[in-house]
């Protein structure tokens, strides 16, 4: 989850960074595998390259949310460690998804550097590295949470979110399948389903669900909160689709390729809804082609249809609805958690 504004304080960030080193060292000395020096160095470099480098907003959100739920300005040492550890599990999950997503999307850059599979000597070893990253999560959870009453709920939560995210990725991939390009399949319902499952659950619901479990809560009692966070995640992904086309690549850390990749983007769905027959013909002839001239024609059509203004209206209406839904929640602490998420992403530029 990209965010600006008021994130975690310096003390929280320092603790978060310190705990990363502890978790990584545990993984590098895991007695379940006899590492050679070469394999240990590979894992060390691979984890740093892929888990670090982002803004860590998903992970830090666990700590911030836990504090708000407890009504505490500061957490005890063990509470901080456990919250940060769950936060890092989400960052590891994000790394796992991104390593594999970049291979499937044939991407070039991620977080301002080459995608891991494009690093010399890595290539498709990155696919196995992704599997290792996912397995690290299970090992971290077992080491630090096995004795907790909510351990089984944590495992279920991560497994459920991973399944939903992978299913969303599948829907995204088969909808944009090479050789079967058919823009008539693209509509707001298909787009909504993809982003709900591909992004919203792991980016928005998972951090808050982790904080709720740490607080001793039963997730079955928070269906409304799940729905609000999924809506927020949808809004976030629409922002992402918008920034893919209109954001500054140097500022957002990646070069947008949704048009070239034939993505079921919010922008193309909006264009299809608004275009006349001649404009639709331009989309059908140019969308999903690598040729810069074709990309330019699509972007020019977006400008003709004034999709920037359409997005601004969508953003404002989404914000109003989310605020109303949040303020309908009976728990003030839960309201604070949800508002903290919303304020981090509202009007973001990266």
From Swiss-Prot:
Binding site for isopentenyl diphosphate: 55, 58, 94, 111
Cofactor note: Binds 2 Mg(2+) ions per subunit.
Annotated Pfam families: polyprenyl_synt
Catalysed transformations (reactions): isopentenyl diphosphate + dimethylallyl diphosphate = (2E)-geranyl diphosphate + diphosphate; isopentenyl diphosphate + (2E)-geranyl diphosphate = (2E,6E)-farnesyl diphosphate + diphosphate
Keywords: Cholesterol biosynthesis, Cholesterol metabolism, Cytoplasm, Isoprene biosynthesis, Lipid biosynthesis, Lipid metabolism, Magnesium, Metal-binding, Steroid biosynthesis, Steroid metabolism, Sterol biosynthesis, Sterol metabolism, Transferase
Binding of dimethylallyl diphosphate, residues: 110, 198-199, 237, 254, 263
Record-listed Mg(2+) 2 binding positions: 101, 105
Co-factor requirement: Mg(2+)
Subcellular location: Cytoplasm
GO annotation (BP), single: cholesterol biosynthetic process
GO molecular function list: (2E,6E)-farnesyl diphosphate synthase activity; dimethylallyltranstransferase activity; metal ion binding
Record function comment: Catalyzes the sequential condensation of isopentenyl pyrophosphate with the allylic pyrophosphates, dimethylallyl pyrophosphate, and then with the resultant geranylpyrophosphate to the ultimate product farnesyl pyrophosphate.
Protein name: Farnesyl pyrophosphate synthase
Biological source species: Zea mays (Maize)
Taxon lineage: Eukaryota, Viridiplantae, Streptophyta, Embryophyta, Tracheophyta
Name of the coding gene: FPS
């Amino acid at each position: 989850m990209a965010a600006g504004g008021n994130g975690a304080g310096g003390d929280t960030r320092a603790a978060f960074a310190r705990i990363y080193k502890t978790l990584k060292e545990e993984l590098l000395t895991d007695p379940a595998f006899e590492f050679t020096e070469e394999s240990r160095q590979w894992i060390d470099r691979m984890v740093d390259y892929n888990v670090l480098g982002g803004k860590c907003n998903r992970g830090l959100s666990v700590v911030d949310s836990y504090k708000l739920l407890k009504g505490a300005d500061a957490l005890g040492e063990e509470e901080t460690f456990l919250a940060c550890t769950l936060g890092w599990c989400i960052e590891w999950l994000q790394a796992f998804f991104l390593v594999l997503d970049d291979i499937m999307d044939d991407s070039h850059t991620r977080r301002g550097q080459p995608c891991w599979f494009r690093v010399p000597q890595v290539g498709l070893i990155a696919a196995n590295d992704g599997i290792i990253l996912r397995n690290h999560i299970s090992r971290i959870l077992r080491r630090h949470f096995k004795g907790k009453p909510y351990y089984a709920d944590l495992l279920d939560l991560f497994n459920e979110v991973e399944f939903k995210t992978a299913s969303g990725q599948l829907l995204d991939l088969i909808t944009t399948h090479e050789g079967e390009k058919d823009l008539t399949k693209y509509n707001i319902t298909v787009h909504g389903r993809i982003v709900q499952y591909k992004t919203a659950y792991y980016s928005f619901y998972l951090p808050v669900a982790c904080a709720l479990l740490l607080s001793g809560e039963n997730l079955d009692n928070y269906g409304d909160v799940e729905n609000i966070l999924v809506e927020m995640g949808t809004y976030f992904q629409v922002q992402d689709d918008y920034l893919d086309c209109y954001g500054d690549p140097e500022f957002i850390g990646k070069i947008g390729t949704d048009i070239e990749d034939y993505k079921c983007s919010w922008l193309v769905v909006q264009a299809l809804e608004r275009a006349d027959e001649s404009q639709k013909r331009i989309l059908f002839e140019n969308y999903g082609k690598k040729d810069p001239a074709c990309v330019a024609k699509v972007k020019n059509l977006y400008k003709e249809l004034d999709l920037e203004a359409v997005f601004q209206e969508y953003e404002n209406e989404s914000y109003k609805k989310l605020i109303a839904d949040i303020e309908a929640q009976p728990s003030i602490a839960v309201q604070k958690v949800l508002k903290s998420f919303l304020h981090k992403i509202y009007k973001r530029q990266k």
